[in-house]
């Protein structure tokens, strides 16, 4: 199974925010490492899209979000259709699910 990968605007913004914060607080080297980890994990999803568990927040919005942990602080939130994996958000695991949904544009 090799599905097309699409990135939502909130996913791109959340990744940019994480990388910007990392550069400021920990340096460019760590930010580049995190970016490589995220991109590598996203590419692996195209071959195994159902490998990550369904997120508990799915019930709140009626959409089956899956969450792939990249490292202990970063999680890829995504959905799967017949032809596409949609990267919906790159989550700092310290962020609450409700805050994440708000940033994704869902009113809860």
PLM-predicted stretches and their roles:
Residues 39-42:
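Compact soluble domain cores
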